[in-house]
Amino acid sequence: MDKRFLLLIWLFLSSTAAIGQTSTGFAPSEGVDLYYETYGEGQPMVIINGGPGFNCKGFQGLAKRLAQQYRVILYDQRGTGRSVMEQIDSTRMTMGLMVADLEALRKHLGFQEWTVLGHSFGGILGNYYAAQHPASLKALIASASGGIDLTLLRSFDLTQRMTTAQRDSFQYWTAQASAGDTSAWADARRRAFMATAYVYDDAHAPRVAERLGQGNPQINQLIWQDLQRIGYSVQAAAGTFEKPVLVIQG
């Protein structure tokens, strides 16, 4: 067999192995052992998924793509997925502790600095982390982030992009849930219509609806309450942050 052909095969297999290389582990933090996964080699990049209250599984595909150039880290935020907590309450579920979790994970993995990519709520957490630990970041990426303060919440309308039929159906099933209908069918219908708010192509809505069913509503509520309690705003810190920042929206 041609030696050049063998070399090409070896190079292909080596690059494929590097991209697909995955390791898992647990990083101790305050009151929780954080489950994490790493992909690829290179400069470290941590992905903070949205929510709050969701595990990191929905971002494994993105992690594998980015692993072609970076060492990508996913982690289950406290109380989600495999980052199990014995008790969840307002003292154990705060933005301050979630920032401490990120620092604990960075130190556990031995990185001096890393790129932080936060999506949706993950962008809010990424901003808050950057405000408190700017030296730990090489760069900050905010993907469809909630912003640098709570201004967005004053005008946010989840149903804005829904059709009239979708909006009516979502509001109907939401009312059913509020009235005490806890059946799996009612929950599935509510998620099915809610998912249409997050996509431009409704063909992708079923995948989003499935993902919405993986969330922990208690964690979601506690963190949003904590954001209100602390008066979340990183405007002052943003003015002095000197690392590269990429904002992705649309």
Language model: regions and residue ranges:
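Glycine-rich His-Gly loop
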Residues: 47-51, 120, 250
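Conserved HGGG/HGGXW glycine-rich cap/lid loop of the alpha/beta-hydrolase fold
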Residues: 29-85, 89
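Conserved hydrolase catalytic core segment
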Residues: 112-154
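Flexible "cap/lid" loop of the alpha/beta hydrolase fold
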Residues: 140-176, 217, 221
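Short beta-strand/loop motif that positions the catalytic acidic residue
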Residues: 241, 247-250
